[in-house]
């Protein structure tokens, strides 16, 4: 086909089968990069031109090896787009696009989606309400935050999804115990005021700066409750034009 394009799809979870099938049905060349542990998963191989397997789980992938592999593939294949199929793969896609100069979301923009500190700083600069927060770079800034912002607070990994790895603290002494335990990795976290209450999420499709579609949902149990007490993440759609939806 004249409009045939080459897509590299990345996923460290088994998902996106329908997307891969549809890409192939449109006449495109489809490559998949996934984890070796998913080799036996029921991928739609008839719709994939070739599968490449990376050792380790998500956080164990060697990005230099990934870059070298895709770079070698590009010696004889023009790559038009890199598509990440899972939230945890966003960094991989932005890393490859930046290094290989492929169109799409780069690392700076990608951090607004995956780096909680960058996300909050961006939202604040746009006038969007945030809980009070602080990076963990500077001791003076941390002490000022603890002395001026009411507890409880939460220490959050900047790169983890949802409420994974969050630590809730109630006083300054305990806060510093946790920060000191992080050692040189403390910069990977941020400090934020805990705000109790219901938690919502809004999913949307935006094209050329215009919101084409959006839907709001409410968690049936907050991510913090699930993280601390176990269970399954569940949410329910908010009916259109209700008070919660408009807010």
PLM regions with names:
Residues 19-23, 120, 143, 179:
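Short amphipathic alpha-helical segments and helix-helix/interface helices
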Residues 30-31, 130-131, 189:
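Hydrophobic anchor at the start of a short beta-strand
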Residues 40-44, 61-65, 112-118, 165, ...:
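Short, charged, surface-exposed secondary-structure boundary motifs
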Residues 123, 146-169, 186-197, 202, ...:
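ATP-grasp fold ATP-binding core
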Residues 72-79, 147-149, 184-185:
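Glycine-rich phosphate-binding loop signature in dinucleotide/nucleotide-binding domains
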Residues 1-108, 140:
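ATP-binding N-terminal substructure of ATP-dependent carboxylate-amine bond-forming enzymes
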Residues 173, 193-247:
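ATP-dependent carboxylate/phosphate-activation module, predominantly the ATP-grasp catalytic core
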Residues 98-165, 172:
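A conserved helix-loop-beta module that forms one wall/lid of the active-site cleft
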